[in-house]
Every structure is written in C-alpha cells, then in structure tokens.
C-alpha cells in the first residue's frame, strides 16, 4: 500500500464515538452535567482544556487506573479499529495517538493496539491509583508539538504525516500535516482538513490514505 509513513489518530469523537473520555468518567462518578457544560464551553472557545482538567481532576482522586480503564472499555468505539491499525502497521506505518484528554485513556489504547507514542493531559498516580492532581496540562497546541517533536526525533517531516480527527483540538495539527481527514467532524475541523469523511467504520480511511498519497 502507498501510505503516509506516519498516521496520527485523535481519540475523543474520532475513535470514541458519541461521547468522550471525560463524559464516560463523569457518568461513572455522577458528574455528567458538570462535564457536559465544560465540554460545551471548550468547544465554543470559552475556556481552555486546562480549565476542564482542573475542574474534573479532583473527582478522580483515589480511583484506580484499572477502574477507569474498565469504564472506558464499555464506551462506544468506532468499528474497524483493530483491522485498520493492523493494516497500517503491516504497511510499516508509524501510529501515533494524539489526544488532549487524560493520558491514562491514551495509555489504555497504546497497550491494546501498539501505538508508537501517545499524548494527553497527565495526572499523578501512585501504585496505579490516581491522585486527582494534574501534573501536565495538554491542549491543541501541545498536541501539534507532540507530533512535531516525535517526527523530528524519528526522522520524518510533517509533510509525511496524515492526521485524523474531528474537532477543535485537531485544527492546529491539520494545518501542519501533509494530509488531514476530518472524520465525522465539526465544521471548524472540516474547514481545516484536506479531506472530509463521514463513516462509522474506521477502515474507510484506508482507501483515502492510499489514494491521497498516490497523488502527492
């Protein structure tokens, strides 16, 4: 297959459909209404992701990463994830997970699917138990730097990157990547992307990745 050698996937709204990591965790903790309002304000550019993190971090104090993973496993994940990642990995494509949500969620997917690197907002933990204290904030600009830094260290240019995402946190990366797919995306992400795709099966990105690379 003729593919971009680096493909970056977003998490919330892209791989996790119809909800977010924060909303799933909030439902578990009985805080759904509060997080829904935070996410509305974030997508309206009224607040930054650090406000979301600071407000919700304390609710997770004393909860184990294993508990959180079990909650996330029951989420509505897009069809075709395993098959898509397997095809890309078999074509020697480096897979990155670029997200601004909690990094423990990204680590769950790295363990399951073998992403070369993942990003996210970090929380202190001891012996697998979350502290409720944010140790590193992460926003859409950090997400771009995460990809830029990984590419620089691994010998790739940003023109060799295909980015797949759905919303505000993907826009800076879309502007820098060689190819970008707005997948089931918001209008701002669609406007920033080189390609727009609506589908409930991730395998549909494969043909688009191949055809786009062939005309580069």
Region spans (language model):
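Metal-dependent phosphoesterase signature
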Residues: 50-83
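Short, surface-exposed acidic
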Residues: 33-39, 65-68, 158
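Active-site neighborhood of HAD-like aspartate-dependent phosphohydrolases
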Residues: 1-50, 54
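Catalytic cores of large soluble enzymes that bind and process phosphate-bearing ligands
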Residues: 17, 44, 48, 60, ...
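Conserved protein kinase catalytic domain
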Residues: 22-26, 57, 190, 206
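C-terminal cap/substrate-recognition subdomain and adjoining C-terminal extension
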Residues: 2, 6, 72-216
């Amino acid at each position: 297959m003729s593919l971009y050698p680096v493909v970056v996937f977003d998490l919330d709204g892209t791989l996790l459909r119809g909800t977010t990591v924060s909303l799933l965790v909030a439902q578990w903790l009985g805080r759904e209404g509060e997080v829904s309002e935070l996410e509305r304000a974030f997508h309206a550019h009224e607040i930054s992701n650090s406000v979301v993190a600071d407000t919700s971090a304390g609710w997770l104090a004393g909860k184990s990463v294993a508990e959180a993973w079990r909650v996330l496993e029951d989420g509505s994940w897009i069809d075709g994830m395993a098959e898509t990642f397997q095809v890309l990995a078999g074509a020697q494509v480096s897979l990155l997970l670029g997200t601004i949500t909690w990094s423990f969620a990204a680590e769950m997917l790295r363990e399951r699917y073998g992403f070369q690197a993942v990003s996210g907002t970090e929380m202190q933990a001891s012996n697998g138990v979350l502290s409720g204290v944010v140790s590193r904030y992460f926003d859409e600009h950090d997400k771009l730097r995460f990809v830029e830094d990984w590419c620089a260290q691994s010998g790739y240019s940003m023109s060799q990157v295909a980015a797949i995402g759905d919303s505000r946190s993907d826009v800076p990366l879309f502007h820098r990547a060689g190819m970008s797919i707005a997948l089931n995306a918001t209008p701002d992400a669609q406007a920033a992307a080189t390609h727009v795709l609506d589908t409930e099966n991730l395998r549909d990105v494969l043909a688009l990745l191949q055809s786009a690379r062939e005309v580069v």
